[in-house]
């Protein structure tokens, strides 16, 4: 008989081993289930928090899931475990195994679940506090928005209440009363400025209100969408409330260039074109009748007193510019000669007159004095050709023949300096004369009627962004229905503005239409006798012959020799005014003496309600720069001859002047080679003075004359047409800091190094207008003349700049107040 007999089901040793082997397997099978349950309990509250569920509910569900029995165990396993436990307890003495860690693992899971519950509770408490603070902030913002809307409504109501009375009062005023109400211009301008600022404030507040309403609408839509999502999906979406609106974004980039505008209207007709070229010379007319005998002439050299030596030495010689000087004193002898007629003698020669008929040869008479030109006689029949007479002394120059072909240009002539040196030169034109003193101001003209309103100018470029303005709050008004769907655009447009102030004179308007041609002028007086012609070739002395026929146009002559250098000529007659000089650099800005006087005289009369301001006159400033040339006025009537001026003081010896113009032709030189003898014409009788012919074509522009002396003061010309508006000049650079001013009148005058008071100290403003010392007594300035247009333009530009600066400062203050209130 054996000691260890195996039963049918197996030996106990084998069962114990099986049980021991099954227990680890059972323990191993239990540990993955517990790990899975713990992981599920940890992930459950996290998923509930992410989905928006309450943290407390999630933690409670997690604890319940941990306390529940594991769902993966079966009853068979429980029975097996019980049997295993009993077997283990019965066989504990026989088997040596490690203790199981199941109880310790479960206690660790409980501690972790408790920690997670505490964390979830703290997170829930923090979310509740934060949500409460956000709700309080939203309530404050809503109260502020309601306050802004209420203030805006009050301001609009006040504007609507005060507007009808002011509009009816402005519209009822007659245009004629506007001129008499110049004293109210300042108050009207202030009212217009206030209304403009109120309109700008209303526009900004309306824009702010629209933005706030849009934000409210978006918040309401988001809340409604969140509520609908929560009811439909059962808490599957986030229920977070939207946060406060963010700050406004930065300004966007500049937009693209706009499309091309519509074509403009048809422009005004252009100016008249330039005059055409001079027409061809007409055919020679018929021969005139024989004229009467002319009056005896007058010896210029015996009549005129006080001739210069250069003129008397040329008596009987070659004539030139020097003989023109002899005409200056012919007025005292009864001959009507003026500077205008003398200058006209320098023009182009007129068309040749009709030749007279040939007369019979008369007996040689005694040489008579030179008489004035006779009148042109009636045209007579053509006589027979007479016998050629004996060549007489040089007669009076005949009528100028037709203009021949232009000859070749000669070599440049020679002239001499004061020392007698010769040097080649052409027609030397002297430098332009110095600018004459400013003419006296004319009498102030009557105030013109206001000009018509000019056409609207082209749209200007987009200006820079203005500064912030002030924010003005009006009294409260009734509160309207706060409907978010109502568009606030109606608040942007205000009532129509009152009619503007009457504009100034329309000097910037368009040029008027060309006037009708004036009536033909009266025939001019008989002009002086022309200058004698050049001496002819020396011939046999004989009786003076009568003027001959006008010969046919001569052939082109040969090129002549260079003549000897001429003598220095006498000073010429006053020439026409020179061309305007080059515009100088811009001078320093003068003192505001005239501007202060203008504001004191004109500004006080326009605004009598303003307090009177007493200005302290400063010392007279330096003379300003010469202004631009004014518009050319219409030619005035010829003034009366002024009386002879007082003899001036003897001046100092001046500097040596520039080289003068070429002098007159020199004395007759040696006789050149005799040319081909021409056929002597039959001397004709002097014709009668012809009638004034029709006005000829405009001649070519003449060369610049010698700068003339200062002429007498002319009468004030009529006001010219308004010129085109000039472009507005850019603002000049800031000037340098001025010198130290004159000490005050109340303080004692400081003494200089020489012990005398400093110059300018103790100066008192004059009681009368300051008049600068004139060059001549005829050039006294007229204080009553209105100021020039340039000063008016400067005044307008300065006023515009001041107004723009005031507007920018007010807008800056308004923007600052607006941001502070927000």
Curated annotation (Swiss-Prot):
**Where does this protein have compositionally biased stretches of type Basic and acidic residues?**
284-293, 403-412, 504-517, 583-602, 638-655
Q: Specify the domain of life of the species encoding this protein.
A: Eukaryota
InterPro entries to which the protein is assigned, alphabetical: Collagen, Collagen_Structural_Proteins
The protein's GO terms of the molecular function aspect are: extracellular matrix structural constituent conferring tensile strength
- Where is region (Disordered) located? 1-45, 66-99, 169-188, 205-297, 345-822
Residues covered by the Collagen-like domain: 241-299, 350-409, 430-469, 493-526, 527-586, 621-680, 681-740
Keyword Metal-binding listed? The answer is no
Subcellular location(s): the record lists: Cell membrane
Topology in the lipid bilayer is annotated as: Single-pass type II membrane protein
- Record's Pfam families? Collagen (PF01391)
Q: Which protein are we looking at?
A: Collagen alpha chain CG42342
Tell me which species this is from: Drosophila melanogaster
């Amino acid at each position: 008989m054996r000691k260890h007999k195996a039963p049918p089901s197996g030996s106990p040793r084998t069962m114990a081993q099986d049980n021991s082997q099954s227990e680890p397997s059972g323990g191993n099978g239990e540990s993955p289930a517990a790990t899975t349950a713990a992981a599920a309990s940890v992930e459950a509250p996290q998923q509930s928090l992410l989905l928006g569920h309450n943290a407390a509910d999630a933690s409670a569900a997690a604890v319940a899931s941990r306390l529940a029995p594991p769902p993966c165990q079966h009853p068979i396993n429980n029975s097996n475990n019980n049997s295993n436990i009993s077997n283990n307890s019965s066989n504990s003495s026989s088997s040596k195994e490690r203790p199981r860690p199941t109880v310790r693992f479960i206690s660790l899971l409980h501690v972790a679940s408790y920690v997670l519950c505490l964390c979830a509770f703290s997170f829930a408490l923090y979310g509740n506090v934060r949500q409460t603070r956000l709700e309080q902030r939203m309530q404050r913002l809503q109260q502020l928005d309601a306050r802004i809307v209420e203030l805006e409504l009050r301001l609009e109501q006040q504007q609507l209440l005060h507007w009808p009375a002011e509009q009816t009062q402005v519209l009822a005023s007659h245009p004629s009363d506007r001129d008499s109400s110049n004293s109210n211009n300042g108050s009207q301008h202030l009212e217009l400025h206030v209304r403009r600022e109120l309109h700008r404030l209303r526009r900004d507040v309306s824009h702010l209100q629209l933005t706030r309403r849009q934000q409210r609408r978006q918040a309401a839509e988001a809340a409604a969408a969140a509520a609908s999502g929560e009811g439909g999906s059962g808490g599957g979406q986030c229920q977070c409330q939207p946060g406060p609106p963010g700050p406004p974004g930065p300004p966007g980039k500049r937009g693209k260039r706009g499309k091309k505008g519509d074509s403009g209207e048809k422009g005004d007709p252009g100016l008249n074109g330039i005059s055409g070229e001079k027409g061809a010379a007409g055919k020679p007319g018929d021969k005139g009748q024989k004229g009467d005998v002319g009056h005896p002439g007058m010896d210029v050299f015996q009549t005129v007193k006080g001739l210069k030596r250069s003129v008397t030495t040329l008596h009987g010689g070659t004539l030139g510019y020097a003989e023109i000087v002899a005409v200056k004193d012919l007025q005292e002898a009864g001959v009507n000669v003026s500077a205008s007629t003398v200058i006209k003698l320098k023009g182009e020669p007129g068309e040749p007159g009709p030749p007279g008929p040939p007369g019979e040869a008369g007996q040689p008479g005694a040489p008579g004095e030179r008489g004035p030109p006779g009148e042109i006689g009636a045209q007579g029949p053509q006589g027979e050709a007479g016998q050629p007479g004996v060549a007489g002394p040089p007669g009076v120059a005949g009528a100028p023949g037709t203009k021949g072909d232009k000859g070749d240009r000669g070599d440049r002539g020679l002239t001499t300096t004061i020392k007698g040196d010769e040097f080649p030169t052409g027609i030397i034109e002297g430098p332009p004369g110095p600018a004459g003193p400013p003419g006296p101001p004319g009498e102030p003209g009557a105030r013109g009627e206001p000009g018509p309103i000019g056409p609207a100018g082209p749209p200007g470029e987009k200006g820079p962004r203005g500064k912030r303005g002030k924010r003005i709050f009006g009294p409260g008004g009734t509160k309207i229905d706060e409907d978010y769907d109502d568009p606030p655009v109606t608040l942007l447009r205000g009532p129509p503005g009152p009619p503007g102030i009457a504009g100034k004179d329309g000097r910037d308007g368009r040029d008027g239409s060309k006037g009708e041609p004036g009536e033909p002028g009266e025939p001019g007086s008989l002009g002086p006798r022309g200058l004698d012609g050049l001496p002819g070739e020396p011939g046999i002395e004989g009786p003076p012959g009568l003027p001959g026929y006008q010969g046919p146009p001569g052939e082109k002559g040969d090129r002549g020799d260079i003549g000897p250098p001429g003598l220095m000529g006498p000073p010429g007659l006053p020439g026409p005014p020179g061309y305007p000089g080059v515009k100088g650099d811009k001078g320093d800005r003068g003192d505001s003496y005239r501007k202060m006087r203008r504001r004191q005289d004109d500004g006080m009369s326009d605004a009598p309600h303003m307090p009177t301001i007493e200005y302290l006159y400063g010392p007279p400033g330096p003379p300003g720069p010469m202004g631009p040339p004014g518009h050319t006025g219409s030619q005035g009537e010829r003034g009366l001859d002024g009386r002879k001026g007082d003899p001036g003081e003897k001046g100092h010896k001046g500097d040596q002047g520039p080289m003068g113009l070429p002098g007159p032709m020199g004395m007759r030189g040696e006789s050149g080679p005799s040319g081909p003898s021409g056929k002597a014409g039959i001397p004709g009788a002097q014709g009668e003075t012809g009638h004034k012919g029709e006005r000829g074509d405009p001649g070519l522009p003449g060369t610049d004359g010698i700068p003339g002396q200062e002429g007498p003061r002319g009468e004030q010309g009529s006001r010219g047409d308004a010129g085109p508006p000039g472009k507005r000049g850019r603002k000049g650079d800031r000037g340098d800091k001025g010198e130290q001013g004159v000490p005050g009148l109340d303080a004692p005058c400081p003494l200089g190094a020489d012990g005398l008071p400093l110059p300018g100290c103790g100066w008192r403003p004059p009681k009368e207008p300051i008049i600068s010392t004139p060059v001549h007594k005829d050039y006294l300035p007229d204080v009553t003349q209105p100021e020039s247009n340039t000063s008016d333009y400067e005044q307008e530009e300065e006023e515009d700049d001041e107004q723009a600066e005031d507007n920018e400062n007010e807008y800056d203050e308004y923007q600052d107040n607006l941001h502070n209130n927000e």
